[in-house]
């Protein structure tokens, strides 16, 4: 994979690509950038059996685009981790399978713009399907499918910022968790047609203790079924 750690050595530089390239890695992260200013375009990213995170962006500024598919299989940590970053990130299709933590985890990105423009498919997580609880900024998902989450399907508890989801399907999450967890959130969120089901257990949407004058909306045609609490 592409591993750049300027923090440990105390160096600072920028990284750019002139032609889109792909990264396909086994037993490591496809990208580990910490911290870095970038102007990069990739045609695809793939990580299998990483001991940490499949894709790991920490303290990244600038622009990073993936025009093709980003894949993380069997990562020891998160499938995709974006943290402490203020860049603009554009992804196309996402496939995350059986990570050891969250499928996608976004943390401390109040000035970032993060777009998942294709179809995001996440399955078999130990943690949340998507964790936005400490993200901030603006995050967009075009089409999302989450199955077999080990905690929340989408965790937005205590979140701030603005979030836009297109069509969203959540099929299976931990019985003591929620399909979408907004507990304590102070965020604006718009969802397209959304379907949430969980084999008769769990809470579909948790709006407890949300704060401030914020808007959370779901498109007409959304459905909740096979849960303990709506």
PLM features per residue range, with description:
Residues 1, 5-28, 37-53, 61-78, ...:
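Beta-strand-rich solenoid/repeat architectures in extracellular/passenger domains
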Residues 32, 56, 131:
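Extracellular glycan-recognition regions
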Residues 34, 83, 133:
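Residue-level marker of regulatory loop/turn positions in helix-turn-helix DNA-binding domains and
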